[in-house]
From Swiss-Prot:
The gene is PPA1. This is Inorganic pyrophosphatase. GO terms for cellular component: cytoplasm. Keywords: Acetylation, Cytoplasm, Hydrolase, Magnesium, Metal-binding, Phosphoprotein. PROSITE patterns: PPASE. The modification N6-acetyllysine is found at K57, K228. Mg(2+) 1 binds at D116, D121, D153. InterPro entries: Pyrophosphatase, Pyrophosphatase_sf. It is found in: Cytoplasm. Its EC number is 3.6.1.1. It comes from Macaca fascicularis.
Length: 289
């Protein structure tokens, strides 16, 4: 979407790497708190964290001031999603809807599990491979209820409103009809993607069936309500940084100079990326249960 830009700090694929978001005035903002949930009527904003086909597990840093995008770290090592045959990296553009929060203190009535303490996730199924940190408008089509290590982790299915075929997609049944096998592959991917790391398969509510657009929008709205409580300090933030520059009713709102000071304290941008381990391209073969 026009008006937003990114600024990288440090080298990609390094522990210090960060992607900050800026508004149309060039001021630093939080992609979690400052980008509006809606881009237009019935259109949601999406923050792209991971471009399709890539492996680096990039995500909004919810506990860091201004919530830049950074690569996830496990036991001191940068995380890369394995290529679980026949897939290569992420099979959609993957990211989050801003101004949403899956509250870890809220037991979801549909799943019986509490939220995962993150913005709600989005799988964008359009034809364009988006860029890390890109802000796009998406049309919501449906949702999948994943249970990740006992936590509710909703996966919204959506399409970029600028996709040439966006007009043909209005609900989850259109995905089933026009992209046969894609939803089944999505369930399979989420079920097994942690297996190469020695983790068990993930589980799902609703017998791994996708719920429709209206159901998905209701879930998104509920996570938006949880976010409102978070950013206005009406609920326990569980270590999340709510620093923002635009939410007038938030006690965490700061001025542009304070936001700039956060970024200026970090390493400068680096033109060359660090070397990605060669085993990131390895295929993993795993028998489905």
């Amino acid at each position: 979407m026009s008006g937003f830009s990114t600024e990288e700090r440090a080298a990609p694929f390094s522990l210090e790497y960060r992607v900050f978001l800026k508004n149309e005035k060039g001021q630093y903002i939080s992609p979690f708190h400052d980008i509006p949930i809606y881009a237009d009527k019935d259109v949601f904003h999406m923050v792209v964290e991971v471009p399709r086909w890539s492996n680096a597990k990039m995500e909004i840093a919810t506990k860091d001031p201004l919530n830049p995008i950074k690569q996830d770290v496990k036991k001191g090592k940068l995380r890369y999603v394995a290529n679980l045959f026949p897939y290569k990296g992420y099979i959609w553009n993957y990211g989050a809807i801003p101004q949403t929060w899956e509250d870890p203190g809220h037991n979801d009535k549909h799943t019986g599990c509490c939220g995962d303490n993150d913005p709600i996730d989005v799988c964008e199924i359009g034809s364009k491979v988006c860029a890390r940190g890109e802000i796009i408008g998406v049309k919501v089509l449906g949702i999948l209820a994943m249970i990740d290590e006992g936590e509710t982790d909703w996966k919204v299915i959506a399409i970029n409103v600028d996709d040439p075929d966006a007009a043909n997609y209005n609900d989850i049944n259109d995905v089933k009809r026009l992209k046969p096998g894609y939803l089944e592959a999505t369930v399979d991917w989420f079920r097994r993607y942690k297996v190469p790391d020695g983790k068990p398969e993930n589980e799902f509510a609703f017998n791994a069936e996708f719920k429709d657009k209206d159901f998905a929008i209701d879930i998104i709205k509920s996570t938006h309500d949880h976010w409102k409580a978070l950013v206005t300090k009406k609920t326990n933030g569980k270590g999340i940084s709510c620093m923002n520059t635009t939410v007038s009713e938030s006690p965490f709102k700061c001025d542009p100079d304070a936001a700039r000071a956060i970024v200026d304290a970090l390493p400068p941008p680096c033109e060359s990326a660090c070397t990605v381990p060669t085993d990131v391209d390895k295929w993993f073969h795993h028998q489905k249960n």
